[in-house]
UniProtKB/Swiss-Prot annotation:
This is Minor capsid protein VP1. One of its GO terms (biological process) is symbiont entry into host cell via permeabilization of host membrane. The keyword Magnesium applies. Capsid proteins self-assembles to form an icosahedral capsid with a T=1 symmetry, about 26 nm in diameter, and consisting of 60 copies of three size variants of the capsid proteins, VP1, and VP3, which differ by the presence of an N-terminal extension in the minor protein VP1. The capsid has a channel at the 5-fold axis and there are densities extending the 5-fold axis into the interior of the capsid. The capsid encapsulates the genomic ssDNA. The N-terminus of Isoform Minor capsid protein VP1, VP1u, contains a phospholipase A2-like region. VP1u may play a role in the disruption of host tight junctions in the airway tract.
Length: 673
């Protein structure tokens, strides 16, 4: 930055309003205008000293550059941010002047002991993956409280996260073998407007499919439920379940104290990686050795360019217990219904369809390759997604009137001799503008065998379909349940679930209460006879002026569901209460590097990776209060099973045992319509 001629008093190419912030300026241009300008002048004198020593400070990152970055790290002025950003880029790209540290001294010293050191230059943030969504930065520092130690959650207080629907990765390098790249984070922080959940799990990922992509037909023994799938060598993380983020006590606190909540931001860190090689020795048996040169591929599909398979209610989400080992699921997707491609050798239509079926290779994307001791992170902003409403009412929209005041509305009726008569409406039975919510109250999901029915509603395509001896209902894709805002004809139609789908465990069947608010599950009837006979509407379609509330959720519910990319849709109202999102968090994919072994055909090293993954979620919450005089119901252990959320003498954990244990929403917080 210093000019070649100190006597020159010109400002050079300084930033407007500054005396020293910019190249080719004088060292004696008057008093600095602010902190950034003063740091720039000090920086110029440092450059001048290096030039006197015969060193070129312009082509090499040097101590004076680092000092400028440090001095301006808290400067929020435009000039301060600009100067800091310029020299951070220089730090990342330019070689260091001999004798200058980039913050990687410890790693450089460790290269004498380890196969690979992690230099500080690796810490430069990479650009986030481009996103199809709007980029809207969100500062969350104002309302985030401190934890018990007085610390704010990891970096949430000092950084902005990516725009809605975008997930960016930044390789942060690491400290090498034997040095931690992050600690264990856990617990939940509650405040008036913000709740922060912090969770860490130990994960393990091994080689999938022998590093191959395969086209497979699954469930071949069951003609009705075969699936044409592409299985891949990749695995992925799935954070889409409330029990992964909230402990039972934290969830009780959330639903008892807050009337509505929604996710706002999420940070995922993958760190403390350990890649190990599995070796079999006749004398020693199986040996697990650290592999310091093997790599783990990782990236986030922030644009959703690959098939999104995080279906609501999937098992293998982040485990509920923090001490559980998370075995990551293998990534596979369904490129087309099997009914339209299974007979492609004899059916011309299916042959043409199969020619157009896509194939996705995840290696077709830029991504990081991390080694033992390294780390990375991804951020996401949920934007203005829907709220989870957590209130109830004992009134219906049709009851919003004063029963003591007469109505001016007239109703007509047929009197004696078919003469039309008119009268004022009864004060207790006056008409309303509002109708109950839509839904289909009937269905056939009551077969004795699961293979005899895929659900109450089934969607399938018939072009080229030839499934011999199998009814369409058994090969279609189910929408279930579908009663919407109406009360179902049968309890068999109700949404039921389990806390886990793990084999060898007791998995009690759970469901949310049928009605804890009078704005759902109505029964719409039509008066069909002069004597007052009525009949139920089995199919109550969407009409103007329908009023209903969203479905309640529980701790075991999924958080979001991805809205398909179509250009026509009706009102989004999920039956299970999950939040519909056009751009949910992108899938974070990982796999082991394929390291060939010479002379053994297509052989490769047998390795696996384990490490920690932490997930911090910022939740926006609201407390509205109520004018209700009477006490309200609260979720309490008094009404729960004695075995709920306990561990037995064999170390087996029991989650929710009965319906009261799931602590559903819409249980309290009375509202006025």
């Amino acid at each position: 930055m210093p000019p070649t001629n100190k006597a020159n008093s010109k400002k050079g190419l300084t930033l407007p309003g500054y005396n020293y912030l910019g190249p080719f300026n004088s060292l004696f241009a008057g008093a600095p205008v602010n902190k950034a300008d003063a740091a720039a002048r000090k920086h110029d004198f440092g450059y001048s000293d290096l030039l006197k020593e015969g060193k070129n400070p312009y082509l090499y990152f040097n101590t004076h550059d680092q000092n400028l970055i440090d001095e301006l790290k808290d400067d929020t002025s435009f000039g301060g941010k600009l100067a800091r950003g310029v020299f951070q880029i220089k730090k990342a790209l330019a070689p260091a002047l001999p004798g200058t540290s980039k913050g990687g001294d410890k790693a450089l010293k460790r290269k004498l002991y380890f196969a690979r050191s992690n230099k500080g230059a690796k810490k430069a943030n990479r650009e986030p993956a481009p996103s199809t969504s709007n980029q809207q930065n969100m500062e969350v520092s104002n309302d985030i409280p401190n934890d018990e130690a007085g610390n704010q959650p990891i970096e949430l207080a000092t950084r902005s996260v990516g725009g809605s629907g975008s997930v960016g990765g930044g390789g942060r390098g690491g400290s090498g073998v034997g040095y931690s790249t992050g600690g264990w984070t856990g617990g939940t922080i509650f405040s008036e407007n913000i709740v922060v959940t912090k969770n860490t799990r130990q994960f393990i990922c091994d080689i999938k499919n022998g590093h191959l992509y395969k086209s497979e037909v699954l469930n071949t023994g069951d003609t009705a439920h075969r699936q044409y799938a592409i299985t891949t060598p990749w695995s992925y993380f799935n954070f889409n379940q409330y029990s992964s983020h909230f402990s039972p006590n934290d969830w009780q606190h959330l639903v008892n104290d807050y009337e509505r909540f929604r996710p706002k931001a999420m940070i995922v860190r993958v760190y403390n990686l350990q890649i190990k090689q599995i070796m079999t020795d006749g004398a020693m048996g199986t040996v697990y050795n650290n592999d310091l040169t093997a790599g783990m591929h990782i990236f986030c599909d922030g644009d959703h360019r690959y098939p999104y398979v995080q279906h609501p209610w999937d098992d293998q989400c982040m485990p509920e217990l923090p001490n559980s080992i998370w075995e990551l699921p293998q990534y596979a997707y369904i490129p087309a219904p099997i009914s339209v491609v299974d007979n492609n050798t004899t059916n011309t239509v299916e042959e043409h369809l199969l020619k157009g079926v896509p194939l996705y290779m995840l290696e077709n994307s830029d991504h990081e390759v991390l080694r033992t001791g390294e780390s990375t992170e991804f951020t996401f902003n949920f934007g203005d997604c829907e709220w989870i409403e957590n209130n109830i009412t004992f009134s219906m929209p049709q009851m919003m009137y004063n029963p003591l005041v007469r109505s001016r509305r007239i109703y007509s009726y047929s009197g004696p001799n078919n003469q039309t008569s008119n009268a004022f409406q009864n004060a207790a039975l006056r008409t309303s503008n509002w109708m109950s919510g839509p839904g289909i109250a009937r269905g056939t999901h009551n077969a004795t065998l699961q293979t005899q029915s895929a659900g109450a509603l089934v969607t399938m395509v018939t072009n080229g379909a030839d499934v011999s001896g199998v009814g369409a209902v058994r090969v279609g894709y189910s929408t279930d349940p579908i009663y919407g805002g109406q009360q179902p004809d049968s309890d068999l139609l109700r949404l039921r679930y389990s806390a886990s789908a793990a084999e060898g465990q007791q998995n009690p069947i759970l469901e949310n209460a049928a009605r804890h608010t009078f704005t759902r599950e109505a029964r719409t009837k039509l008066i069909t006879g002069s004597n007052g006979a009525d009949g139920n509407y089995k199919e109550w379609w969407m009409l103007p002026n329908q009023m209903w509330d969203s479905a309640p959720i529980s701790r075991y519910n999924p958080i979001w569901v991805k809205v398909p990319r179509v250009n026509r849709k009706t009102l989004l109202d999920t039956q299970d209460g999950s939040i519909p999102m056009s751009h949910p968090p992108g899938t974070i994919f990982i796999k082991l590097a394929r390291i060939p072994v010479p002379g053994n055909g297509d052989s490769f090293l047998n390795i696996y990776v384990t490490g920690q993954v932490s997930c911090e979620v910022v939740w926006e919450v609201e407390k509205r209060g109520t004018k209700n005089w009477r006490p309200e119901y609260m979720h309490s252990a008094t009404n729960m099973s004695v075995d709920a959320y306990t561990i037995n003498n064999a170390g087996v954990y029991a989650g929710a045992v009965q319906n009261a244990d799931v602590m559903q929403t819409r249980f309290n917080h009375h509202k006025v319509l």
